[in-house]
Structure formats: C-alpha cells, structure tokens
C-alpha cells in the first residue's frame, strides 16, 4: 500500500494594530480561528502584534512593553488556543531577559507545548525603524522546530533580507520558512516603496532553497510622538505565501485584513528539492568569505 503524502496547510494573517494589547490579541485569536476554519495547520501572526510598532521612536517608556518569556500572558493564551484548535502558532513578542531585551518569537506546537524561542538576529536602525535602541542582537542562532505537521524555520522581519538566514534554516531541514514582519513606508522618503522588492527577495529564498515560505505583515497607519514631532508609517501589508519554486500561491493587498491559506505536499517538495541538486552541488569549502564583513578571503 502506498504511503500517504504529508500534506500541510499554512496560513498568514494580516491586520491593523491598535495600541491596546487586549484588542490586538483578540483580533489575532479571531483570525487564528478563521484560519483554522479554512483548514490551516500552521498559522503565522505578524511581528510584535500586541501593539503599535513602537520602534518608530526612541522612548525609554516603551521598554515597559517588554515582558519575560516564561509566563508571558499572550504566549500562554496562544498555547491554550493552539491546544484547543490543534494548530501550530509562532508568537512574536517583545522579550525582557534581566537587563537584555529581544525581538523574539515563541513556537507553540499543536498540543500547546512551547517548543522554544528564536531571537531576531539582524537588528535594523534607520528612520522609523530604530530597533537597535530597544533590542539586543539575538543569541539563539537560526533554528528549526519540529512541530506536529512539519519541521519549520522561523526568522523575523529584517532577517528576511539576508539569504544566509534562509539557507541556514534550510540546511537544518526546514520544510517551510516563516517570517513575521512589520514593514511599510519610509518616514524620511515618501517616494520609497519597498513592497515589491520585499516580496521578491523572499520569493527568491523560497526558490533558491526549494521550500515554501510564509510572510505576515501588518497594515494601517501608525503615528508615534517623538521629541522632533510625529513619526508616521503606513504599513503596506502584502502578506503572502510562496511555493517551493518561488511562485506566489496566495497574496494580500495593502489595506485589507486577510487570512491567506495554502496547502503543500511536503513529500513531493522533498523529492523536488533532492532532485534539483542545489544541496548536492554545494561547495561549503568555498564559502568562507561569507564569514567576513569586508569580503576578504580568509583562506591563504
């Protein structure tokens, strides 16, 4: 008798955030339930969904938004929800760890078990995205998590612009890549629109590694008061799911709330990945230059 292929249905959520934690967590739960109704097994919520994207401004008071990982109320609530519905939920949050702070995601398995933590590795610093003020560079390294439905890799927002991160997770056996995100307009340049670039970069990761990829981004205009006036970002959504050759399988627009779903045959994709040869023909002995900042070759 032929073995059944492993089918997994993934989902990306997209919604506008208020600056009220309870409202945002309730919205996330409502959309998780909607995704479950559509058959989703692994459901991605956007980055730092508990409130506004506070990193627009450097304000000491915003450190009060951070909470310790263990016993975090939103993680506990999502554990209960995951167990009730039998779904996997990566949960993004602002983590306080003694005197360190991280942009983190906890991976909740379908029985409510917390599988562990990933801390954002690449921390941006620019107008409107002043994350270095709040977050230490992550110390977990890129990881994969064996969930009930698939082995997954999860990284966060700015990580998605680095092909090394996607490849590191794929090399560890990630069968699907997930990127919770908060990205939109550039306060210093009204003419800069990165949405298409943003999507294409990750479609490239999917195609280069022959794995599906899920990206969840917020929508809506958020205004943060600063000492120099207001900072404003309009988040452009554009959440999407890409297939293992980089093709767009499901995509949202820039204004509407969305629940995107797509199903993948993991065994079929595994065969394609092995047959394509990109892992067979790798030359790690020639890649040492990737371990340098200036491109110098350390091999004499």
From Swiss-Prot:
Single GO MF descriptor: N-carbamoylputrescine amidase activity
Domain CN hydrolase: from-to ranges: 8-266
Gene3D superfamilies given in the database record: Carbon-nitrogen hydrolase
InterPro entries found in the cross-reference section: Aliph_Amidase/BUP, C-N_Hydrolase, C-N_Hydrolase_sf, N-carbamoylputrescine_amidase
Keyword Transmembrane: no
Top-level class of the enzyme under EC nomenclature: hydrolase
NCBIfam families hit by this protein: agmatine_aguB
Pathway it works in: Amine and polyamine biosynthesis; putrescine biosynthesis via agmatine pathway; putrescine from N-carbamoylputrescine (amidase route): step 1/1
Any one Gene Ontology BP term: putrescine biosynthetic process from arginine
Superkingdom in the source lineage: Eukaryota
Protein's name in the database: N-carbamoylputrescine amidase
Record's function text: Involved in polyamine biosynthesis.
Protein source organism: Solanum tuberosum (Potato)
Subunit text: Homooctamer.
EC number: 3.5.1.53
Keyword terms of this UniProt record: Hydrolase, Polyamine biosynthesis
């Amino acid at each position: 008798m032929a073995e059944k292929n492993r089918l997994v249905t993934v989902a990306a959520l997209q919604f506008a955030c208020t600056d009220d934690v309870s409202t945002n967590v309730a919205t996330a739960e409502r959309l998780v339930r909607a995704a479950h109704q559509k058959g989703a097994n692994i459901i991605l919520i956007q980055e730092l969904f508990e409130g506004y994207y506070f990193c627009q401004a450097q304000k000491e008071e915003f450190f009060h938004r951070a909470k310790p990982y263990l016993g975090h109320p939103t993680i506990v609530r999502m554990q209960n929800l995951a167990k009730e519905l039998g779904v996997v939920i990566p949960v993004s949050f602002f983590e306080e760890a003694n005197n360190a702070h991280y942009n983190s995601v906890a991976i909740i398995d379908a029985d409510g078990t917390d599988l562990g933590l990933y801390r954002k590795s690449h921390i941006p610093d620019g107008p409107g995205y002043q994350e270095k003020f709040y977050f230490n560079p992550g110390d977990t390294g890129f990881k994969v998590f064996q969930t009930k439905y698939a082995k997954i890799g999860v990284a966060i927002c700015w990580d998605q612009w680095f092909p090394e991160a996607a490849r590191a997770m794929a090399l560890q056996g990630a069968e699907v890549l997930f990127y919770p995100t908060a990205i939109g307009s550039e306060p210093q340049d009204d003419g800069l629109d990165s949405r298409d670039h943003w999507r294409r970069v990750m479609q490239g990761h999917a195609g280069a590694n022959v794995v599906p990829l899920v990206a969840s981004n917020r929508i809506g205009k958020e205004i943060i008061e600063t000492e120099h006036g207001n900072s404003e970002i309009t988040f452009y959504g554009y959440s999407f799911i890409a297939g293992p050759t980089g093709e767009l399988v499901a995509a949202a627009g820039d204004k509407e709330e969305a629940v995107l779903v797509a199903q993948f045959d993991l065994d079929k994709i595994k065969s394609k990945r092995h047959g394509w040869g990109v892992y067979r023909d790798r030359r790690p002995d020639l890649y040492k230059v990737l371990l340098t900042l200036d491109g110098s070759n350390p091999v004499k």
